[in-house]
Amino acid sequence: MDAHAIEEGRRRWQARYDAARKRDADFTTLSGDPVEPVYGPRPGDTYEGFERIGWPGEYPFTRGLHPTGYRGRTWTIRQFAGFGNAEQTNERYKMILAAGGGGLSVAFDMPTLMGRDSDDPRSLGEVGHCGVAIDSAADMEVLFKDIPLGDVTTSMTISGPAVPVFCMYLVAAERQGVDPGVLNGTLQTDIFKEYIAQKEWLFQPEPHLRLIGDLMEYCAAGIPAYKPLSVSGYHIREAGSTAAQELAYTLADGFGYVELGLSRGLDVDVFAPGLSFFFDAHVDFFEEIAKFRAARRIWARWMRDVYGAKSEKAQWLRFHTQTAGVSLTAQQPYNNVVRTAVEALAAVLGGTNSLHTNALDETLALPSEQAAEIALRTQQVLMEETGVANVADPLGGSWYVEQLTDRIEADAEKIFEQIKERGLRAHPDGRHPIGPITSGILRGIEDGWFTGEIAESAFRYQQALEKGDKKVVGVNVHTGSVTGDLEILRVSHEVEREQVRVLAERKAARDETAVRGALDGMLAAARSGANMIEPMLEAVRAEATLGEICGVLRDEWGVYTEPAGF
């Protein structure tokens, strides 16, 4: 790009920066020297390929979505938490908010993730152990007791039963007297990643996609600030993928949901701003930064050039980041504080919109209160003490970072071509029921391609660890020292017994005729092809449980069986 074009871009950026609201903060170094909000080529310099880098807040958004970077608003500290029953988790949320957390992120237990009630025999021994147990709207009310849902943003990592759980959230807000139009947060409705990596689905893929489409329509019409579809790469990376695979599979899943919205006749400029993303921040510092920068650039280009998005907000890739649980070790667990800090810094330098930092004890148990507080303080030290929020994309222009960004983008584009090719094999006439990327994803799920590719990457990494080619301190190098015992959080089995007892009381107290009628109405909607959200809300209002709602739909739609593979 020639010097004139670069200066034109700088002037556009400056005008937008000047017009934007900034935080009241001291944007100087520790020595007192002022720092610019962004850095770029010197006036008069040329820079080949600068149009791919650009300025913050301008297409292709490599350097961030906003002209101010974090000077306008810092990332949201959103700590993932949930254990035991709703009352216990409510107390943890209040602790997080009181300690300076900016939002909430709900971790659900395994029965809830699988759409089962706490009294289901298959739930025995799992209730409240890896997250909070939620059986009905009454539990959701307790979960957010004394936390005004109109004032706090809430993320829910739930996937399979995402739609009925979100209906419980809406009913809890209703009972607080909160207008659904002001609710803000994200819902991890992404079902593709369940078939690809996490393996916690409920139905066949097509009914899941139908529910997601219903929710997209419903939220676009009445809950504009809420992001009804968070597309997750985190679970893909934690399953063993490479950074490029995480990026490509996640963005491809996002493109699939865009095709789903378009197939429903929705306006891309209306529904696409409701999509958000969830990425892993692994320990390879510069590769992670490059991954985040490439993600914004790829998404913007595809949304504009492939799917016809005209508004900037429809081209924006907003993402939450969680530090890499898979990078943490049970050996010498205090080292995990350092790993998490490095990963969090990579996420911030990559421009994350919100961040969860893992606790040092998560390889051993759910985080203790002390470990959770250290994880929270890690972000606060980065935000308040280091100056990393003063300059937008401070590594932009680095030869290393720019080449890494280009490389990971090119690797992702190759994977997109592989996915499209699989879609063409499924529909050689080019008549895709939803869209070409969606066809490729469904074909890759059905024949086990995604799972096989991730397994191969995980195997190669494990081989490198065992050979010593990849070093992990405390595991295969520097293994000698002992760092002391940790206080471990243990969820009592009494929690399960109490949850089952309360569930029985609530079932006994409800109007069974109303419950049966609401479930029948939901089933009728499932059979007719009508939008499922209002009938599901009626079932939730009648105190139908999660297991009952999901059970009706399982019986109607069937359960997916994964293909065997070695």
Regions picked out by a protein language model, each given a short descriptive name:
Residues D267-F271, A309-T323, Q331-N358, T363, ...:
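Flexible glycine/proline-rich, aromatic-decorated loop/lid segments
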Residues M1, D135, T153, I158-P161, ...:
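Phosphate/diphosphate-binding loops
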Residues V165, Y169, D253-G254, F277-M303, ...:
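Extended, hydrophobic alpha-helical segments in both membrane/secreted and soluble proteins
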Residues G101-G102, K145-L149, V171-D179, G213-A225, ...:
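Generic secondary-structure signature for well-ordered alpha-helical cores
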Residues G125-H129, E194-F203, I236-S241, F279-E287, ...:
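Short beta-alpha connecting loops at secondary-structure transitions
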